[in-house]
């Protein structure tokens, strides 16, 4: 049943109907559409459109429909309704007859769909925060179990300075903390109810929109009807948050792929998250991580598509806005799946501590410690930097690590070097000295783990 047929003398062509109809994807808003309709029925009582008995009859029927939807949401797709609003109204009329035709009084599909998608987005934020929190918890657990696994830290994908695997894990905990915070911020900005804004100019019925907002779980009612029905900021903001978080997850996945490679051999991924080759029997491919990395582009594409869709739209509602749903549905589903899979990847990960330590000992990653040692001896840092650079060139030439050079060899470059240089050049010393807040010293890493555990516990 179309909701707009009276103006037309011909039926819509089936080709247009197939092109125009949105039930095949907006059926996912069924619960929100029904809950919004219950709220609107109560508002109509307050302005005399419905009696209390009529409202109660409508609410009972809507609640019955809600139970049916929750038990089998896919059944909606068997209908040929134009959209989820048409479907709900037709099913309501089937249950209560002509009384169901009164429910849309004073309401437009424009404010109705704006409400539905906001309610859906709010629910998704909560679920996504749980998923972010759970991945943080798994990273913290992995860090706690690998506090003594020393590995090289990288810049430009070249060995730079020693870090611990735990410190690496905690870096991603911090990225996810910002993602969690952005979700909370986005929730606060979308917590305004557009219902009662009508098509664009507001409803002609003097409903108490603040009470309506509270009934539907919002903090307050929107302030401008034009903005209310055309606002898709909350979708774009969620897509932006999802995209940035997927960038974080993609970097995590890329690190894991590198660490898992035969060349690095820092970690071994479980058989449960890897696959083989149809040709090469020896292969064990990090498919879970590669898919996370690949899906980042898909989510970012949804953000780009939505921004381009709305950038030139005049106020207020335009049918272009129907394109908001498939992108946000797919992007948030994908993000949630990737958060869950990243946590699963960490469940059975094995860190090759001997290999990571061996790699940390190579690449002259203790060169900065030697420069700091010279500074402590009174050499200006810029000079010490140059001296150590020359020393590294020499060490490479003679195939030695800095810690393997003799005092005589050191003194070819600086006569202030003494026997006390050797403890400074050890991996443990390199870690221990980085003891400022946020540093890689074991003490600071342990503090970071404890702090993160407290923050995660508070999110429950």
UniProtKB/Swiss-Prot annotation:
Q: Provide one Gene Ontology cellular component.
A: cytosol
Q: Which SUPFAM superfamilies match?
A: L-aspartase-like
Q: What chemistry does it catalyse, as a reaction equation? A: 2-(N(omega)-L-arginino)succinate = fumarate + L-arginine
Top EC category: lyase
Molecular function as annotated in GO: argininosuccinate lyase activity
Please indicate which superkingdom the organism of origin belongs to. Bacteria
Keywords tagged on the record: Amino-acid biosynthesis, Arginine biosynthesis, Cytoplasm, Lyase
Pfam families on file:
ASL_C2, Lyase_1
Give a GO biological-process term.
L-arginine biosynthetic process
Kindly give the InterPro entries that the UniProt entry links to this protein. Arg_succ_lyase_C, Argininosuccinate_lyase, Fumarase/histidase_N, Fumarate_lyase_CS, Fumarate_lyase_fam, Fumarate_lyase_N, L-Aspartase-like
- Annotated compartments: Cytoplasm
Q: In which pathway does it act?
A: Amino-acid biosynthesis; L-arginine biosynthesis; L-arginine from L-ornithine and carbamoyl phosphate: step 3/3
Q: What is its EC number?
A: 4.3.2.1
According to its UniProt record, which protein family does this protein belong to? Belongs to the lyase 1 family. Argininosuccinate lyase subfamily.
Question: What's the protein here called?
Answer: Argininosuccinate lyase
Which organism is this protein's natural source? Mannheimia succiniciproducens (strain KCTC 0769BP / MBEL55E)
